[in-house]
Amino acid sequence: MAAALLVIAWDASAAGPLLVADTFTATTANMTPAGVNLRMQIIQWQDAAARTEVVATLAADPDASTLAKLPTVGYVWPNGSPVGYSVKYANHAPEPDGKERVTLVTDKHLGSYDFKGWSAATAGGSDKPYSVIELELNSSGTGTGTFSLGAEVLLDEAAGTVALKPGGQTLLTNVKRAAGQADKGSRP
């Protein structure tokens, strides 16, 4: 029995701490609740095959319980909340003008843990059981963003990508990449 406990403790310590590939912060705006600070931690940027698997799952069965079974590649943490949202899709796409687009999909819609759910100032968003978050960053790592509460979700199964329909409300302001993470080589 003591040997079994020793092996379990050894395995747990061998895993070590989870390393974070990238961290972004943002503040909710033009919605209820406004002013909520979010921290988005990416443990691992996904390759094309992993992203395609998530998109196929979303296209076949957009039920959150099915999405929850996919590997977790990050978390979205609302400020002051002990509960975060699991990120199941994480894509980083540099754009020709030096900007970058970050797209994340969580297995539950943002605000689902709150007593009163989150709502956008104007209609036009998605009622999916998950959230799609898009961040638009300039070359200095700052910008704005939105998520599926304020924009329609677009799935491209052939390309294995998720996006939000252009022109959606800006629901995330003060978007920033955490200091010291702008030049990480961990992005596919």
Place the predicted regions along the sequence by residue:
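Mature extracytoplasmic/lumenal regions of exported proteins
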Residues: G74, V83-P188
